Amino acid sequence: MSLSITHEKSLIDNYIWILFDKSKAIVIDPGESEKIINFLDKNNLTLEFIFLTHGHCDHTKGVFSLKEKFPNASLFVPIGLELGLGESIIKEGDELNLLNSTFNVLELPGHTDNHIGIMYKDNLFCGDVLFSAGCGRVGSNYKDMYLSLKKIKSMDDKTKIYFSHEYTLDNLKFAHYIDPKNKNIINYIEVFKEKPDTVSAPTTLLLEKEINPFLRLSENIDIKNKINNEFDAFVYLRKLKDKFNSI
């Protein structure tokens, strides 16, 4: 039996992911706690497990209150993240059986040097590594982020991508700037014009291969200054995106 998956919007543009069965729940990246507790209480759910993909406060701040209310909930964190809450470290290759379901851990450094992703069936919870039509800012080094995106790109096209921020419209504007004739990008922008509050998560890997410039490096290989390899193209695009709003 598959777990149900839903989200709560958090802070300005965060998504907190909740997976649950009839009585128990798993929470991923709780940037705040009140909405999560309300959801759990409303649905008579006990919080059993918490995952953190990385240590930024907009993904972790709610964990302290959640552990106060649910002290028996197990907390899983990447290597190097110490919160003093009895957390368990998880790493690449770990397989966890939770709520009669299998979860696999992927190391996806780049946004932070210890960032992880969580795979449940064909669902990837990727934190701040990949967004729809974009990717996270580089906080460790460009090579790490490039390789993490390549790892995701190698997955099955049917993979559902559960990212942690609703940046899609801004990302699409940059994608259109880079690839102005891409009809898939143009059509997706129209969706947001018609429904500005569109929730774009989860996306699919297939869609991202059509619209996301950071997964289309071979298509963008000769942009602007005739870059001739994918890694340099990635670095160029990521730096350009960092200053795009001022262009």
Swiss-Prot record:
Its cofactor is Zn(2+). GO terms for biological process: methylglyoxal catabolic process to D-lactate via S-lactoyl-glutathione. It is an enzyme of class 3 (hydrolase). Zn(2+) 2 binds at residues 58-59, 128, 165. The keyword Metal-binding applies. Zn(2+) 1 binds at residues 54, 56, 111, 128. Keywords: Hydrolase, Metal-binding, Zinc. Pathway: Secondary metabolite metabolism; methylglyoxal degradation; (R)-lactate from methylglyoxal: step 2/2. It catalyses: an S-(2-hydroxyacyl)glutathione + H2O = a 2-hydroxy carboxylate + glutathione + H(+). It comes from the Bacteria. Monomer. Thiolesterase that catalyzes the hydrolysis of S-D-lactoyl-glutathione to form glutathione and D-lactic acid. This is Hydroxyacylglutathione hydrolase 1. It comes from Vibrio vulnificus (strain YJ016). The lineage of its organism: Bacteria, Pseudomonadati, Pseudomonadota, Gammaproteobacteria, Vibrionales.
